[in-house]
């Protein structure tokens, strides 16, 4: 058992709500240990120093979990920091433990208070071990960070004097929930200098960083004693060039600093912000580069790249990547700025494929799937966002289906059977829940009693689709029961595939899948072979999930719908699959037409409005310069970035052979665009870099495919198959 389990949870004897607490312990170490190891965690987020030096470059530890079920602890080698006389200092802020959606108050530790647990083990050459634990010998005091909140920011008062450190209280908080670090650490990844200094018509001093980011500022501040600088972080300017913060809802996103007359380097520690712009009050600024924005996200290795001859599509890919950077902080969140920032399951499942191409997210999602398992109800349902404090029964199709889609996609990308096995029960329990729901429906509920249809449950629907007259509506026109039944079939099919990979008998589920399809066709496909619900998303789901073998009528229906509107109308549910389906039915020109479209609604429309990340809504900022409803209008929301996997798989043609995983057997089949000169993409797999490029050369196209060691590959060009060799392969056609 790790050393931390011998330590005690401690809290300050006195603590004002929302103030950062500094914990301290002075100890001696006889010269000199050959190894010193620190294990540490907190109810809140911590920043730890030994003898004035940070023990890690990671931030916002211990990360975000459901603290009632799982709390990560970290282990650091601190050998180089140990001296004869030592002081360990740990600042702890409230972090993710207490906020609007996640208040874990209890009698042991009330709202706005924090706690710490830590253990240091000193090991000497002769084998002797000395341990220092958190206990009642530690002391604490309030810090100069007088306020901290994940949504609202920090207030730092350098005039505050903490006074005497006083003994802490040991609290009987459980250690049963402590687990070793599972996910990637959150770290500072990039630094962006201010690009433009703006004086708004309303008189605000604004700095534009030119890129929407998630992170915080760093700058030097000196004022007269008592001077206060207040900095607001936000995403957009109005059409008149003024500060726009309404879409943050109740989140303040503010940093306030009160001067003691000395120069200080300012960098928040216990919070993060989502922003492109800052508005500075109380400080004279002569140049925008007096401020830098520090980008933070989980420490994932970049693995996927894309480039083409169309700069707007390059910007789209840039926005997809930055949407991922801005929302992958230990948990895949929907947005990083407003009073939400939650691990919405639907957003994660639609984006997980392209996420796994852009970055190595195996460890990141392994941790979050642990969160999913911890929060899955006994019934099998998954809450709508994870972690959560709410007794949310979940069960919305396309959201709770993260239980099957995410584990399967991680297996496909990385080929890790053990990770799939670890989450098999997660998958099975969700499918079993839908089956049990279908079985228990009653005639008086006004819905079908067909035992193979997942109907009558609540669902979010095709979220933010544009196929209702009211473009501010959120649920879309697609029948929610169609979505429910389609995903019931799809999740069952994925469970069957997982069972076959793991050697688990799945005859029951194969029979179940056959009957779900039969019932789906009977109720939702008309006598002409078309969907009874005449929406793009309904057709897309039936085609992409293979729910009806006679595809031609459905393909015609979808094509006519897209052409009649002249644009996509899909929301969160249909959009990820739309271009894939159009390509699969031979409508490649139509797929490219949608991708390249610059007018609203489209993927490129936000780029014409200066977007540097993906938007939550197709109409977040309208052509007339007005905003969509501020109740739900994030400008950093990655879900629609799911189109990126079509860019990898169809435009550049990198896909895996059916029935394989881990990119061990590849089929290159790129779709050349009439309106583009070249396109290229690469994905770093466990065996090496897989790359594809096509470039027009007169009447011909030069295809270049790169195949790593231990990888089989073919190319399919104009219907002809080519067996490829390891290394670089060129084909002209």
What would you call each of these model-derived segments?
Residues 37-40, 216-235, 270, 346-375, ...:
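Alpha-helical support elements that line or immediately flank enzyme active sites
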Residues 88, 154-157, 339-340, 358, ...:
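C-terminal capping/lid segments that line or modulate ligand- or cofactor-binding pockets
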């Amino acid at each position: 058992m790790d050393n931390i389990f011998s330590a005690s949870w401690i809290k300050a004897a006195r603590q004002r709500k929302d103030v950062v607490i500094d914990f301290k312990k002075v100890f001696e170490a006889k010269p000199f240990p050959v190894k010193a190891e620190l294990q540490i965690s907190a109810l809140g987020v911590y920043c730890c120093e030994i003898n004035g030096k940070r023990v890690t470059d990671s931030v916002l530890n211990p990360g975000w979990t459901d603290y009632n079920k799982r709390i990560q602890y970290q282990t650091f080698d601190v050998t180089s920091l140990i001296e004869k006389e030592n002081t360990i200092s740990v600042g702890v802020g409230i972090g993710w433990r207490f906020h609007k959606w996640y208040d874990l108050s209890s009698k042991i530790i009330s709202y706005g208070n924090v706690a710490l647990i830590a253990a240091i083990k000193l090991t000497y050459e002769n084998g002797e071990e000395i341990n220092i634990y958190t206990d009642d010998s530690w002391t604490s005091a309030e810090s100069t960070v007088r306020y901290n909140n994940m949504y609202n920011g920090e207030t730092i008062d350098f005039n505050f004097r903490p006074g005497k450190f006083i003994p802490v209280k040991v609290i009987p908080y459980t250690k049963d929930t402590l687990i070793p670090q599972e996910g990637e650490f959150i770290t500072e990844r990039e630094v962006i200098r201010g690009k433009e200094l703006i004086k708004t018509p309303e008189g605000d001093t604004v700095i534009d960083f030119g890129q929407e980011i998630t992170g915080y500022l760093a700058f030097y501040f000196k004022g007269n004693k008592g001077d206060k600088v207040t900095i607001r972080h936000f995403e957009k300017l109005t059409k008149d060039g003024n500060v726009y913060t309404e879409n943050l809802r109740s989140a303040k996103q503010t940093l306030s600093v009160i001067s003691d007359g000395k120069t200080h380097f300012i960098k928040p520690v216990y919070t993060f912000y989502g922003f492109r712009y800052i508005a500075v009050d109380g400080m004279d600024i002569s140049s925008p580069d007096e401020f830098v924005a520090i980008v933070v996200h989980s420490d994932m290795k970049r693995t996927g790249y894309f480039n083409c001859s169309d700069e707007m599509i390059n910007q789209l890919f840039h926005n997809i990547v930055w949407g991922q950077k801005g929302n992958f902080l230990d948990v895949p969140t929907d947005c990083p700025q407003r009073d939400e920032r939650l691990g919405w399951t639907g957003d994660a499942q639609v984006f997980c494929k392209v996420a796994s191409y852009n970055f190595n997210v195996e460890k990141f999602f392994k941790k979050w799937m642990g969160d999913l398992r911890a929060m899955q109800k006994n019934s099998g349902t998954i809450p709508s966002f994870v972690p959560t404090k709410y007794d949310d029964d979940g069960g919305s199709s396309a959201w709770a289906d993260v239980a099957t889609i995410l584990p399967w996609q991680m297996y496909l990308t990385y080929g890790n059977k053990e990770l799939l096995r670890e989450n098999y029960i997660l998958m099975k329990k969700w499918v079993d829940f839908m089956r049990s729901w279908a079985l228990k429906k009653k005639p008086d509920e006004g819905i079908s009693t067909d035992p193979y249809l997942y109907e009558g449950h609540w669902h979010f629907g095709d979220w933010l689709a544009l196929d209702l007259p009211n473009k501010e509506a959120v649920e879309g026109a697609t029948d929610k029961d169609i979505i429910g039944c389609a995903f019931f079939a799809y999740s069952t099919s994925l469970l069957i595939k997982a069972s076959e990979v793991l050697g688990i008998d799945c005859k029951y589920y194969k029979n179940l899948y056959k009957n779900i399809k039969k019932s789906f066709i009977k109720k939702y496909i008309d006598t002409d072979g078309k969907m009874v619900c005449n929406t793009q998303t309904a057709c897309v789901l039936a085609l992409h999930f293979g729910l009806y073998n006679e595809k031609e009528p459905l393909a015609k229906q979808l094509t006519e719908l897209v052409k009649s509107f002249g644009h996509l109308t899909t929301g969160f549910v249909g959009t990820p699959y739309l271009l894939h389906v159009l390509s699969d039915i031979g409508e490649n020109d139509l797929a490219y037409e949608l991708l390249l479209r610059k007018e609203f609604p489209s993927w490129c429309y936000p780029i014409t409005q200066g977007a540097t990340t993906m938007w939550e809504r197709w109409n977040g900022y309208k052509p007339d310069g007005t905003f969509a409803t501020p109740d739900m209008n994030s400008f950093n929301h990655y879900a629609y970035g799911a189109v990126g996997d079509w860019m990898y798989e169809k435009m550049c043609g990198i896909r895996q052979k059916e029935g394989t995983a881990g990119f061990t057997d590849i089929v290159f089949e790129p779709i050349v665009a009439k309106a583009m000169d070249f396109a290229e993409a690469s994905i770093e797999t466990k065996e090496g870099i897989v790359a594809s490029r096509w470039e027009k050369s007169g009447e011909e196209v030069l295809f270049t495919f790169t195949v790593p060691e231990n990888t089989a590959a073919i190319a399919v060009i104009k219907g002809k198959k080519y067996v490829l060799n390891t290394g670089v392969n060129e084909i002209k056609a």
